[in-house]
Amino acid sequence: MDLSTTNAAGAVYDTYLNNFKNQDGSVNWLPVCADAHGFVVNKDLFEKYDIPLPTDYESFVSACQAFDEVGIRGFTADYYYDYTCMETLQGLSASELSSGDGRKWRTIYSDPDNTKREGLDSTVWPEAFERMEQFIQDTGLSQDDLDMNYDDVVEMYKSGKLAM
């Protein structure tokens, strides 16, 4: 179904809509006005081990550590897919990307008229990658996690080997 001529597509700025156009100009997906991120938790494991459900980053890290102490993986995701890595980085870089410098970088990066290749800068990205490095340490992610696909994660979750 081509949505390119619909009222819904007409309500989307071309800057955003262009990212969803196929080579023939058709549009099969529209960007939404919100993007939600969160974690699925195995509440039974939290209750069984009397570990409080996380409400912020600090309590998330504490929960990961508490589960590690009882031999259960606190957190992982389907990092086999590049979009999971990118979504994680996006979530961890929200404060940098919404800063003045971050908005400036995003504007230049996404400008279709910009013919100069825009890479990662040294203002916005160092802190984002430092935060990503800390997240990797806090959650115990390893090289093996890069091979975890959706089915692997679901199986760990269902078998009680994964809390989040």
Regions flagged by a language model, labelled:
Residues 57-61, 143-158:
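Short helix-initiation/N-cap motifs at beta->coil->alpha
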Residues 16, 42, 56-63, 85-88, ...:
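Stable alpha-helical elements in mature extracytoplasmic
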Residues 34-36, 41, 152:
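A conserved catalytic-core signature of glycosyltransferases
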Residues 1-37, 52, 61, 87-88, ...:
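Hinge/lid segment of periplasmic solute-binding proteins
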Residues 70-74, 159-164:
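Alpha-to-beta junction loops
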Residues 28-29, 69-79:
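Bilobed periplasmic-binding protein-like "clamshell/Venus-flytrap" ligand-binding domains
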Residues 66, 107-145:
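Glycine-centered hinge/linker elements that transmit conformational signals in sensory
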Residues 43-55, 138-141:
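Aromatic-glycine-rich donor-binding/catalytic loop that engages nucleotide-sugar donors
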